[in-house]
């Protein structure tokens, strides 16, 4: 792989100061050079272990330190996870992500996690996990099980990070990304807009991500979901244009990465989401629950896709657009009655 040129803070700052209309044009041009602008990759996120997390991430309702009304749950049984994966596939998802609310997995959990990965892969889905800090051996075991992606967000800039989290250092996050990459697993890493950070901090986050030895294959950009009981519950709302600008700059700086709309889509209207797609977003989380917060209902996503002329990216088993659209529509006629998408924010 050719060496990636490193971005400088002055270059990123220049992008943040660029007129939005010009920025969107540049981002869309770059997007079309590397992706089909009418295709969006669809992922489903499941919380395989919910609540009682010992970390103090100020945005997260899963932290045991905050009273958010969330009930803790043990690690799910493997077959429960695989049944959720089957339903996700039937609803049109091509990637199944599994998140656990803890600082790091215990070695006793690894056999179950490996079985989950193998089972998801056997269904023809891409697999992704977000489990916190990993050791070298844990990363290798997940790789040998066939894990495609590992999510571990940087959240914000190194300078602002200490205002949000104190139980895990920024360097720990970078080290985990290195271990995942060394094990041969693709990297999923992004951050959150709306933590109280400055524009310079948003630039710093994207600078860190784009200047990794190999940029993440997948970059989730979250809009803060303010949950009562967390320290950030009263933060100011994120301006939609500021969020769209962040998406566009992520696309420009990481032209071959999937840029994913993650937490916060529920509070975005159709116009904001449409502009995010125009800015270069080409992946979404799809399902009933994201984090322990709402995600747009599947039928609303399908309606928006139709309005914009967007098609969900095809599954691993090749099929025509019409066939996939019909299958997706049929799945949406039977709304999900189990809250198995009660997942941790990525």
From Swiss-Prot:
Binding site for [4Fe-4S] cluster: 53, 57, 60
Cofactor remark from the record: Binds 1 [4Fe-4S] cluster. The cluster is coordinated with 3 cysteines and an exchangeable S-adenosyl-L-methionine. Binds 1 [2Fe-2S] cluster. The cluster is coordinated with 3 cysteines and 1 arginine.
GO molecular function, one term: 2 iron, 2 sulfur cluster binding
Cofactor dependency: [4Fe-4S] cluster; [2Fe-2S] cluster
GO BP annotation list: biotin biosynthetic process
Matches recorded under Gene3D superfamilies: Aldolase class I
Domain Radical SAM core: 38-256
Role description: Catalyzes the conversion of dethiobiotin (DTB) to biotin by the insertion of a sulfur atom into dethiobiotin via a radical-based mechanism.
Oligomeric and partner information: Homodimer.
Similarity-based family: Belongs to the radical SAM superfamily. Biotin synthase family.
Name of the protein: Biotin synthase
Species, as recorded: Klebsiella pneumoniae subsp. pneumoniae (strain ATCC 700721 / MGH 78578)
Gene: bioB
């Amino acid at each position: 792989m050719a060496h990636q040129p490193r971005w400088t803070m002055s270059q990123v700052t220049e992008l943040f100061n660029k007129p939005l209309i010009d920025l969107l044009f540049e981002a869309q041009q770059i997007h079309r050079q590397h992706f089909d602008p009418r295709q969006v990759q669809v992922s489903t996120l499941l919380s395989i272990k919910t609540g009682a997390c010992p970390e103090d991430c100020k945005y997260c309702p899963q932290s045991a330190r905050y009273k958010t009304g969330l009930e803790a749950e043990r690690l799910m049984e493997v077959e429960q996870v695989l049944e959720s994966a089957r339903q996700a596939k039937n609803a049109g998802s091509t990637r199944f992500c599994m998140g656990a609310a803890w600082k790091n997995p215990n070695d006793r959990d690894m056999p179950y996690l490996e079985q989950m990965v193998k089972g998801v892969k056997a269904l023809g889905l891409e697999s992704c996990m977000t489990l916190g800090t990993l050791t070298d051996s844990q990363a290798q075991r997940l790789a040998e099980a066939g894990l495609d992606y590992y999510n571990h967000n940087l959240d914000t800039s190194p300078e602002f990070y200490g205002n949000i989290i104190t139980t895990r250092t920024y360097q720990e996050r970078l080290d985990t990304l290195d271990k995942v990459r060394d094990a041969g697993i693709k990297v999923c890493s992004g951050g959150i807009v709306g933590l109280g950070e400055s524009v310079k901090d948003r630039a710093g986050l994207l600078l860190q991500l784009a200047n990794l030895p190999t940029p993440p294959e997948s970059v989730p950009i979250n809009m803060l979901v303010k949950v009562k009981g967390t320290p950030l519950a009263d933060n100011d709302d994120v301006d939609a244009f500021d969020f769209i600008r962040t998406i566009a700059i992520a696309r420009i700086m990481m032209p071959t990465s999937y840029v994913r709309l993650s937490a916060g889509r529920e509070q975005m209207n159709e116009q904001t989401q449409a502009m995010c797609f125009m800015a270069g977003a080409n992946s979404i989380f799809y399902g009933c629950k994201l984090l322990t917060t709402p995600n747009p209902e599947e039928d609303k996503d399908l309606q928006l896709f139709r309005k914009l002329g967007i098609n969900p990216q095809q599954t691993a088993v090749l099929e025509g657009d019409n066939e996939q659209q019909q299958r997706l529509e049929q799945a949406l006629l039977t709304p999900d009655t189990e809250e198995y998408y009660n997942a941790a924010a990525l």
